[in-house]
């Protein structure tokens, strides 16, 4: 899966071992808004990957850094952003295109508080 394939990239960028949690895909449609939020505690590290869609302009994801500065990042098809989803508020303003396809993968630190949460506590990947 995408989550397993991107684990080494996340580890290389963070210089730390991670444990995969879960992945999901989402399709956003015209006028969609992703409200400002933080992810649940077990989402220590998050990755969002743009799969493209039907739009004239890239739809930025906005994130507040640890000093409360807002940064809005435009991801083109195939681009990814690694971020601390449980720590940093993130959102997307109104989408003006037709559709936007996105994959989200979440990880925890292999030596952290949630190290026993492989696959979000499931016995196998992809099973409830």
Task: State each model region's role.
Residues 1-24, 36-38:
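Signature of the catalytic double-stranded beta-helix
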Residues 12-18, 53-56, 96-98:
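Secondary-structure boundary elements
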Residues 30-87, 91, 99-103, 110-124:
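Catalytic core of non-heme Fe(II) oxygenases with the double-stranded beta-helix
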Residues 127-128:
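Low-complexity, Gly/Ser/Thr/Pro-rich intrinsically disordered linker/tail segments
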Residues 27:
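Conserved active-site beta-strand element of glycosyltransferases/polysaccharide synthases
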């Amino acid at each position: 899966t995408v989550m397993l394939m991107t684990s080494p990239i996340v580890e290389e960028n963070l210089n730390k071992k991670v444990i995969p949690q879960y992945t999901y895909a989402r399709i956003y449609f015209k006028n969609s808004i992703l409200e400002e939020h933080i992810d649940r505690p077990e989402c220590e590290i998050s990755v969002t990957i743009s799969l493209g869609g039907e739009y004239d302009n890239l739809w930025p994801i906005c994130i507040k850094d640890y000093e409360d500065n807002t940064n809005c990042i435009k991801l083109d098809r195939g681009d990814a952003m690694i971020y601390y989803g449980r720590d940093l508020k993130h959102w997307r303003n109104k989408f003006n295109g037709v559709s936007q396809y996105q994959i989200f993968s979440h990880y925890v630190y292999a030596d952290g508080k949630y190290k026993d949460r492989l696959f979000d506590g499931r016995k196998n990947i992809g099973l409830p």
